[in-house]
Amino acid sequence: MAPKKHSGFMMFVNEWRNRNAEGRRMTLAQAVSHCGTIWEKMNTQQRGPYNSGGKDANVAQRAKRESSNGHGQVDKAQREATESLMDMKRTIERLVLNAKMSHDLENAKFVFVAFNYFTKALTTDVYVPAEFAACEYSLKEGIRSIYSTMIDPGQIIFGQGSDALLHSSTTHDLPLPPNALGEKNMTKLYRNIVDYLSKCQGKGKTLVVFTPAENITMVKSCFRYLECDDDFRDGGEKIQVFDIQYLLFILKKEVMNVADLNDEKINKFATDAFFKKDFFEFTAGIACQYHEDNDRTKYCTQSMVTRWAYTFTDFMCGDLAITVQPGKHIPAQTKPNYLIISSYASSLDHESSFDSFYSLPGSGVKKESQPEACSLSSSRLSVASSSYKPIDHTSFAANLNEVSEFPSLGMRNSSKHHGIAASAQREWNARNLPTHSRLIRKVSDNDFSVNGADGKLKK
């Protein structure tokens, strides 16, 4: 049954009943009968407000009905997600532009955060946190400070122990509750995190943290999990979680603009690809002690935020001519995994046509007596004075009758199927081979005869 529409006359009836005590004592039918005579005497101008009110009521009812079905809810959710994304991008752009306009872009401070979790609810975005790390970073100073802690939530979602065990064993390898490590008081932990973020960004400022786009939902859920037991959370600061990859893109564009460099080739796809390469993934000494001992440094949150800081340094500090400091901009111990060879080193040895990295003297193993950094002249001298002579192993001699040296291609018939004629043919062909390739036939005394030997024996 279609819903009834609001009319201008009924709007007038309802208003008359609300304003007159006599109308409030009447039934709806009596009020309609009484107001009908009054409505007939009213002109178009007097009826106008009531007719307009009836149309507005119909529109409001239709909008309410559409929002109650599935399509209305989906559209609303998509609208909210789009607005949230645009608001996040505008906020990131404003943060970077404000630092640029104040000529302090290299000193702008950003906080990177990462969470590990035990399990996720099947039907909702509820994550049970297991580990947290935050890093304060600026282009000029690199890593300013790191906050890292493990989390013991006390229990995991009922019925998801197997999922939690599988996720833990394939990622961070942290023990599950009730044997979990770290802080057990969620309220205390959340306040410590808020205090750290406030110290990094200043009191009274909005708490903004950055994490990869695919982790934003998980990080927001973990923050909600930690603050749910805090009785004073309504009056506290709200933590905003933004996309670190979009920050990298905007910051790179502005850095190149400040350095007066061409940024036409810089786009979101290029910066995302650079970030996801994770060049410092296997760097030692940047994870917590637990993950260092268990060889799970890749999944350690402390290692994650540190690697992101190194990635920002690697991508932008060179554009601003910022001197990098080991342990802050790059790993404290960096071992080069390459060897520089002069482009014309092979031309110094004219007798060799097979020069390569492995054929050059001393390229494979570094002698202890030689210094690490050698000059170009010393490198040329060592190559020229070497007695190394490359050998050409591409030519060799072999017996054509040896099956092991020349394996048959396909189904080669065995010699036992050829008979006497085939054997004789092979012996004849062997006589045409070079001397050093002929078969050595075993001989006996009967194969040799001496002239006159038989006659002497007879006598």
Swiss-Prot record:
Superkingdom classification of source: Eukaryota
Described purpose of this protein according to its UniProt entry: Involved both in the piRNA and miRNA metabolic processes. As a component of the meiotic nuage, plays a central role during oogenesis by repressing transposable elements and preventing their mobilization, which is essential for the germline integrity. Repression of transposable elements is mediated via the piRNA metabolic process, which mediates the repression of transposable elements during meiosis by forming complexes composed of piRNAs and Piwi proteins and governs the repression of transposons.
Biased composition (Basic and acidic residues): 63-78
InterPro entries on file: HMG_box_dom_sf (IPR036910), Maelstrom (IPR024970), Protein_maelstrom (IPR039259)
Family indicated by similarity: Belongs to the maelstrom family.
Tissue: In germaria and egg chambers, it is detected in the germline. In the germarium, it is in all regions, including region I where the germ cells are dividing. In early egg chambers, it is uniformly distributed throughout the nurse cells and oocyte but, by stage 5, it is most concentrated around the outer margins of the cells, closest to the periphery of the egg chamber. Level decreases in stages 5 and 6, but most noticeably in the oocyte, where protein level remains. No detectable protein from stage 8 onward (at protein level).
Protein name: Protein maelstrom
Disordered, as annotated region: 43-78
Subcellular localization(s) per the UniProt record: Cytoplasm; Nucleus; Cytoplasm, Perinuclear region; Cytoplasm, Cytoplasmic ribonucleoprotein granule
DNA-binding region range list: 2-69
Effects seen without this gene: Female sterility and defects in karyosome formation and oocyte polarity due to transposable element derepression. Ovary shows mislocalization of 2 proteins involved in the microRNA and/or RNAi pathways, Dicer and AGO2. In testis, transit-amplifying cysts fail to differentiate into primary spermatocytes, instead breaking down into ectopic germline stem cells (GSC) and smaller cysts, due to a depletion of Bag-of-marbles (Bam) protein.
Keyword list, A-Z: Cytoplasm, Developmental protein, Differentiation, DNA-binding, Meiosis, Nucleus, Oogenesis, Repressor, RNA-mediated gene silencing, Transcription, Transcription regulation
Annotated GO biological process: cytoskeleton organization; dorsal appendage formation; dorsal/ventral axis specification; germ-line stem cell population maintenance; intracellular mRNA localization; male meiotic nuclear division; microtubule organizing center organization; miRNA metabolic process
GO molecular function: sequence-specific DNA binding; transcription cis-regulatory region binding
Stated consequence of mutating H291A: Reduces nuclear aCCumulation in ovary and ovarian somatic cells. Affects transposable element silencing. Causes female sterility
Organism of this sequence: Drosophila melanogaster (Fruit fly)
Gene Ontology CC annotations of this record: cytoplasm; nucleus; P granule; perinuclear region of cytoplasm
